[in-house]
C-alpha cells in the first residue's frame, strides 16, 4: 500500500449479508422494523410530521482519500443530521447506501465506529440501506420528526429578520481547497481547518430550540 495515500481498497473478504450483519446491524427501539426486511417501518409520534434529507459523499469531491475511516463515518451521518437540524427536526432513523471498491474490514470497522458513535449521541437508528461494489461512494437518507406546522423552512425568512450564524463559515471548504492545492494556506491553519472538513458538528439541539 502506498504510505503517502491511504487506499480504501484492500481485498474482498466479506459477502454483502455478512458485511451488513457485522458492521451495520443493531437492535432498534424506536422503529417498528429495521435492517433485514424489504422495507423499514417507522411510526412517528402523534401530531408529528416527517422530515427527510439525503446527501451523497464522493471521494475526491467531498472528502480526502487520506481521511481516517472513523472520521468519514462521522461526516457521512453528520451532514444529514445538519439538514434535519436546519428544519428543527428530531432525528429518528436513517438508511445507508454504500459503494465499496473492496470489502476492507479495517476500513469498515473504523467507518462503522464513527457512524455509530454519532448515531448514538443523537438517538438515530439505522433501519436499512444497500451495499454494492464500485468506487467509494456514500449516500445516507435521514428521517426526523417535527410538530406539525413547525418545520423551519428557508421560505420562512422575512425582510428585517435577524440572521444568526453558529460556527464559522467556510472552514471546511477552505480545508478541502487547501489540501487540493487550489488555495494557499500555511500548515498550521490548514491542520486546524481539517477538523471542520472531517468532523462537522450537527447543531441538532440548536435547531429544535429555534422552532
List the model feature ranges, each with a label:
Residues 1-211:
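Helix-biased detector of long, well-ordered alpha-helical tracts
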Amino acid at each position: 500500500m502506498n504510505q503517502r495515500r491511504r487506499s480504501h481498497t484492500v481485498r474482498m473478504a466479506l459477502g454483502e449479508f455478512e458485511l451488513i450483519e457485522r458492521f451495520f446491524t443493531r437492535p432498534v427501539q424506536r422503529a417498528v422494523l429495521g435492517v433485514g426486511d424489504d422495507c423499514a417501518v417507522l411510526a412517528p409520534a402523534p401530531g408529528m410530521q416527517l422530515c427527510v434529507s439525503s446527501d451523497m459523499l464522493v471521494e475526491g469531491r467531498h472528502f480526502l482519500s487520506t481521511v481516517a475511516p472513523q472520521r468519514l463515518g462521522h461526516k457521512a451521518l453528520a451532514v444529514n443530521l445538519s439538514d434535519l437540524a436546519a428544519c428543527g427536526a428530531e432525528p429518528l432513523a436513517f438508511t445507508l447506501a454504500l459503494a465499496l471498491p473492496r470489502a476492507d474490514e479495517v476500513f469498515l470497522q473504523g467507518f462503522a465506529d464513527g457512524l455509530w458513535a454519532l448515531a448514538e449521541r443523537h438517538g438515530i437508528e439505522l433501519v436499512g440501506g444497500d451495499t454494492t461494489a464500485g468506487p467509494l461512494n456514500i449516500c445516507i437518507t435521514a428521517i426526523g420528526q417535527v410538530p406539525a406546522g413547525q418545520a423551519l423552512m428557508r421560505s420562512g425568512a422575512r425582510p428585517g429578520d435577524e440572521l444568526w450564524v453558529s460556527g464559522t463559515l467556510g472552514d471546511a471548504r477552505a480545508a478541502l481547497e487547501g489540501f487540493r492545492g487550489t488555495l494557499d494556506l500555511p500548515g498550521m491553519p490548514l491542520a486546524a481547518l481539517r477538523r471542520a472538513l472531517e468532523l462537522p458538528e450537527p447543531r441538532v439541539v440548536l435547531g429544535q430550540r429555534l422552532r
